[in-house]
UniProtKB/Swiss-Prot annotation:
One of its GO terms (molecular function) is NAD binding. It is found in: Cytoplasm. The gene is argC. It comes from Shewanella piezotolerans (strain WP3 / JCM 13877). This is N-acetyl-gamma-glutamyl-phosphate reductase. Pathway: Amino-acid biosynthesis; L-arginine biosynthesis; N(2)-acetyl-L-ornithine from L-glutamate: step 3/4. Coiled coil: none annotated. The active site is at C155.
Length: 329
């Protein structure tokens, strides 16, 4: 039995990972934590999320006593916290010898110089960063199994990279174009005017400046054009990706490239069939559909995930189970 502490458990992602870990044989929850200043401290998780009324745990403030208890009792920590908060907490718990699964962007880039531009802070822990592994579960399992500092990928990068990485050897120098739509939960639980019921509408945001663009490009090894959109639905991501493939590429070459997922139970790839967001909501799956035009060598790929599941919590659970050598269900 491995004990997992969850910090930031009051948010959508934190609550989701709590539910998943609570249901896992072989894993137990050491405690649920929020910041000392949180208005949710002391509340039961079920008070915030009646859906989780079967989870009889309260949200404790993360003070010094709580941190000491985590170090003594837990095998791993999940951080569902803000980037700057995770920056410091991840380094501290890692240095105490715990496995850290960080859902923020604080450890996703290897290069220190990317953090001031894309996250607005200077990274203070270069040695911890050097030890961090990018937790794209289907692609980095060996490193995830041996590292104690796992940077769980962002939601858009998970959808995009799962679709694109098998094609890396078939791409030309023409930048892939990624247009992706996310549900409102991707913006977090905090009340904001543009995500309120009467205001939310399909709209692009972060155009030519979203921090997930360099994350995708870094992991793919090629620059991309990425445009995220806010959709007027609760959860899910649908990415539509247009790429140019090398001259002479055939549909059979594409089929062969995607055979890398033949033994990946959570990824399904189909030719000429395209997923809907509803196909993946509340699941840990990634559904990919593609169609190829041999006359122009252009390929259109769609990738659908649940942003709170495969895009965050269930991928973190995958990483936890890989790290602790448990088989995926």
């Amino acid at each position: 039995m491995k004990n997992i502490a969850i910090i930031g458990a009051s948010g959508y992602t934190g609550a989701q990972i709590t539910s998943l870990i609570n249901a896992e044989m072989g894993l137990s929850i050491q405690g649920l934590y929020v910041s000392e200043n949180s208005l949710d401290k002391g509340k039961a998780l079920a008070e915030l999320y009646p859906t989780y009324s079967h989870i009889h745990l309260c949200l404790s403030p993360l003070n010094d006593d709580a941190k000491a208890a985590i170090v003594e009792q837990a095998d791993a920590v999940v951080l569902a916290t803000d980037h700057v908060v995770s920056l410091h907490l991840a380094a501290w718990f890692y240095q105490q010898g715990l496995a850290v699964f960080d859902l923020s962007g604080a450890y996703r880039f290897e290069a220190l110089d990317k953090y001031p531009k894309w996250y607005g802070f200077t990274h203070e822990y270069p040695q911890v960063l050097a030890d961090a592994v990018y937790g794209l579960a289907e692609w980095n399992a060996e490193k995830i199994a041996t590292s104690k500092m796992i940077a769980v990928p962002g939601c858009y990068p998970t959808a995009s990279l799962t679709a694109l990485k098998p094609l890396a050897d078939l791409l030309t120098d023409v930048m892939p174009v990624i247009n992706a739509v996310s549900g409102v939960t991707g913006a977090g639980r905090k009340a904001q005017l543009h995500t309120s019921f009467c205001e939310v509408s399909l709209t692009p945001y972060g155009v030519l400046g979203h921090r997930h663009q360099p994350e995708i490009a870094t992991q793919l090894g090629q620059e991309v054009i990425f445009t995220p959109h806010l959709g007027n639905f609760k959860r899910g991501i649908l990415a539509t990706i247009t790429v140019q493939l090398a001259q002479g590429t055939t549909a059979k070459d594409i089929e062969a490239a995607y055979q890398c997922y033949d033994n990946a139970p959570l990824v399904t790839v189909k030719q000429n069939q395209f997923p809907k967001v509803d196909d993946v909501v509340q699941t840990p799956n990634c559904l990919i559909g593609w169609k190829f035009d041999p006359e122009t060598n252009y390929l259109v790929v769609t990738s659908a995930i649940d942003n709170l599941m495969k895009g965050a919590a269930s991928q973190a659970l995958q990483c936890i189970k890989i790290h602790f050598n448990e088989l995926l269900k």
